[in-house]
């Protein structure tokens, strides 16, 4: 008889994964390059003797046909072993099993089953890495945030982005540490086209054209008063005048190449005004991630140290939300969605899981959560004191944010979950 088998003289190049994309299922694909002509079919004559020698036999030496005949006749081999239930410890009461049709533990009894039925997952696509930047060349550690630095806006910044991309993280949000000499009551440095943030955006987009760059739209890093808006002589934060400045800031960032502008200041009407300003300048494709439910939280302390942006007087309770309020988030969600927001963000994250779920249930827009500096520092401190397992608590906290309904998470841990999922341990 004649059999047709493929024959190819081509040499196939070896390939291997260079990072966790290759072995963690993060959406990577590999093309196997070939050289030489296309494979062709060659007829090979097989003799009857060769065909008989190729008859497949079971490990016992008997052919498949013989085994099938035994099965039809009801002759089955004896099992090699009989599985027995392990013995319970002495003193365990002997009882009749409970009469239950449903036992949820059945679906949790092995790692394979638990993985098969897991409802929530985390991937690098769900993570956004915040980056603190400053004008200096050297990276400066942030005391209240172990492992975080104010990055030199060129070398240190690029190194951090390279590390994140190595584990599949391609989204970044920028927060500038602005010199005091550039701060003013009206925050005019916020829309300087040659300022720190626009220069950083251009640098990143030149080196990594495919990354997603989020920017913060707020005056507090640029304000000599440390507030998110212009402060009147009597201490009142001016809303509409601040929104005017924010529009110029957002346009400046979009002009530099920002993909997503993120108004975090909680001024009324800011989203609609920024959307109109962007569209008027031709930036119809630039998205807006609104800090929809940003609470006046005590969890922001380390962040404000990182940027030296603490209010010089008072607090931010006249514009940020009361932590005691739940229904108010519905008002903010409806307003921002109507004004043209593309993404709705809840901040802080873990203490406000109910607000994340509320937003998820009441909007079809993507929901973001910010695991803020205080949440990060608590986990780091607990791990350093060996009071908790830092890696496990970090993963659980992020999984909880995803389970509550967050599509994306802004977190200072962003480089670590992909490394953990790859089996490489916490990224350094």
Swiss-Prot record:
Active site (record annotation): 294 (schiff-base intermediate with substrate), 347 (schiff-base intermediate with substrate)
Pfam families: ALAD
Annotated cofactor note: Binds 2 magnesium ions per monomer. The first magnesium ion is required for catalysis. The second functions as allosteric activator.
Annotated binding of 5-aminolevulinate 2, by residue: 373, 412
Pathway(s) where this gene product acts: Porphyrin-containing compound metabolism; protoporphyrin-IX biosynthesis; coproporphyrinogen-III from 5-aminolevulinate: step 1/4
Principal localisation: plastid
A GO MF term: porphobilinogen synthase activity
EC class name: lyase
Residue sites binding 5-aminolevulinate 1 per the record: 304, 316
Residue ranges the record marks as coiled coil: none
Gene3D superfamilies tied to this protein: Aldolase class I
Family annotation (PROSITE patterns): D_ALA_DEHYDRATASE (PS00169)
Key words, A-Z: Allosteric enzyme, Chlorophyll biosynthesis, Chloroplast, Heme biosynthesis, Lyase, Magnesium, Metal-binding, Plastid, Porphyrin biosynthesis, Transit peptide
Localization per record: Plastid, Chloroplast
Binding site for Mg(2+): 332
The reaction(s) this protein catalyses: 2 5-aminolevulinate = porphobilinogen + 2 H2O + H(+)
Swiss-Prot/TrEMBL cofactor(s): Mg(2+)
Cellular component annotations (GO), alphabetically ordered: chloroplast; cytosol
GO biological process, one term: chlorophyll biosynthetic process
Annotated EC: 4.2.1.24
Subunit structure of this chain's protein: Homooctamer.
Entry similarity comment: Belongs to the ALAD family.
Function as written in the Swiss-Prot or TrEMBL entry: Catalyzes an early step in the biosynthesis of tetrapyrroles. Binds two molecules of 5-aminolevulinate per subunit, each at a distinct site, and catalyzes their condensation to form porphobilinogen.
Record's protein name: Delta-aminolevulinic acid dehydratase, chloroplastic
Gene source species: Hordeum vulgare (Barley)
């Amino acid at each position: 008889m004649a059999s047709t088998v493929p024959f190819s003289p081509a040499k196939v190049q070896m390939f291997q994964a260079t990072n966790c994309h290759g072995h963690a299922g993060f959406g990577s694909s590999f093309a196997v390059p070939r050289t030489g002509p296309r494979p062709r079919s060659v007829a090979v004559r097989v003799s009857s003797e060769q065909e008989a020698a190729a008859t497949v036999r079971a490990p016992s030496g008997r052919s498949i046909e013989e085994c099938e005949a035994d099965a039809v006749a009801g002759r089955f081999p004896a099992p090699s072993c009989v599985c027995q239930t392990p013995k319970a410890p002495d003193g365990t009461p002997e009882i009749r099993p409970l009469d239950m049709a449903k036992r949820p533990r059945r679906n949790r009894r092995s790692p394979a089953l638990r993985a098969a039925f897991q409802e929530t997952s985390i991937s690098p696509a769900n993570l956004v890495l915040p980056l603190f930047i400053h004008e200096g060349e050297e990276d400066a550690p942030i005391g209240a945030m172990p492992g975080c630095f104010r990055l030199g806006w060129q070398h240190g910044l690029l190194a951090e982005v390279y590390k994140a991309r190595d584990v599949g993280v391609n989204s970044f949000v920028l927060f500038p540490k602005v010199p005091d000499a550039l701060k003013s009551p009206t925050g005019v440095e916020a829309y300087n086209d040659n300022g720190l943030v626009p220069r950083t955006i251009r640098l990143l987009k030149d080196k990594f054209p495919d990354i997603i760059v989020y920017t913060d739209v707020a005056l507090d890093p640029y304000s000599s008063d440390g507030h998110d808006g212009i402060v009147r002589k009597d201490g009142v934060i001016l809303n509409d005048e601040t929104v005017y400045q924010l529009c110029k800031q957002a346009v400046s960032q979009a002009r530099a190449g920002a993909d997503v502008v993120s108004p975090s200041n909680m001024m009324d009407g800011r989203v609609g005004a920024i959307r109109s300003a962007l569209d008027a300048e031709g930036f119809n494709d630039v998205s807006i991630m609104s800090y929809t439910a940003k609470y006046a939280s005590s969890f922001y302390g380390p962040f404000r140290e990182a940027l030296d942006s603490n209010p010089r007087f008072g607090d931010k309770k006249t514009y940020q939300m009361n932590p005691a309020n739940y229904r108010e988030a519905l008002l903010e969600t409806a307003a921002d969605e109507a004004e043209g927001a593309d993404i709705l963000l809840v901040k802080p994250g873990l203490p406000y899981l109910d607000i994340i779920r509320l937003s998820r249930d009441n909007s079809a827009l993507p929901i973001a959560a910010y695991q803020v500096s205080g949440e990060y520092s608590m986990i780091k401190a607990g791990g350093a004191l060996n009071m908790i397992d830092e890696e496990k608590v970090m993963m659980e906290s992020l999984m909880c944010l995803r389970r509550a309904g967050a599509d994306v998470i802004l977190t200072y841990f962003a480089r670590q979950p992909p490394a953990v999922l790859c089996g490489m341990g916490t990224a350094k």
